[in-house]
Amino acid sequence: MTPPPARTAEQRKKDTLHRLEHDVDVWVSTAGPDGGAPYLVPLSFVWDGATLLIATPAESPTGRNLVATGRTRLGLGPTRDVVLIEGTVQAVTPEDLPEEDAEVFAGKTGFDPRQLSTRYLYFRILPQRVQAWREENELRGRELMRDGTWITP
């Protein structure tokens, strides 16, 4: 099978931003502090143009790991059109999340953690590194963001 021609960096960034704006779910990977076991879970998210907002039970492995380490790695899209995002994380209680943000999250994802008896936390993820590629011919130049700054115009 011959892959399609490699996209330009500008097209990859455009496709990545489209996916962030329109996709609903992302794979969230975490690990416990001090080399703890890795953990992977799909969660719904909202992109506000600068950060991703997710929610998970405070006492879940993902919630505990995010609080303890303040870091995550996300996988967005299918394996042959993947976006990998490494980010720093800020925990936000439902009480501290602006009402408008909670409403946007519930509206886009169809899920409102504020309505549940289980204690949830929201997490804002600030991307630090973004990579995107489809096939082997896009491995070179896959890095779109480094140190929190887009390197692709």
Where in the sequence are the language-model features?
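Generic structural signal for secondary-structure transition and capping sites
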Residues: V24-D25, R71, G110, V130
